[in-house]
């Protein structure tokens, strides 16, 4: 067993240091950015804020609201194909992600959703434990199946696993285990990592 005894930080531990600016008002700040990705030729422009793929936040209703502001929603994986069919016309494909799990049924559902609108660029592969070896293999399989999609994978919290997922074909890695306000992973399982340090370290992968 190895114990890490250096200081790790959460967002509550830090403040943003002010600095000189040429802006007169916060309303002048432009949040939109242009993005390119490692494994696909797809590009994206918008505000890089994602609503998570939880069943309470990654909803069609959330997506309709956030797309007006060029923000993204990872639609949760519990919707059926029929529910997708009923809502697909209300969704801007630039600002949503399909979410799937690891099973063959998930893979097939992903294919069928993209058949409804192949302009959807994002595919989120979501599992409870991103540290399993079979998850890395699943990311490789999804990359081979959807070579032009922007693939998101997670969750993990450390640099070495972030690197493994990127090498397997992920363009974006979801960072964080247990930081959510209602998440019980840390209190029940004792597993996690202070979120700010986790993001900082994983960004070097």
Stretches found by the model and what they are:
Residues 1-205:
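Active-site entrance/lid segments in N-terminal catalytic domains of soluble metabolic enzymes
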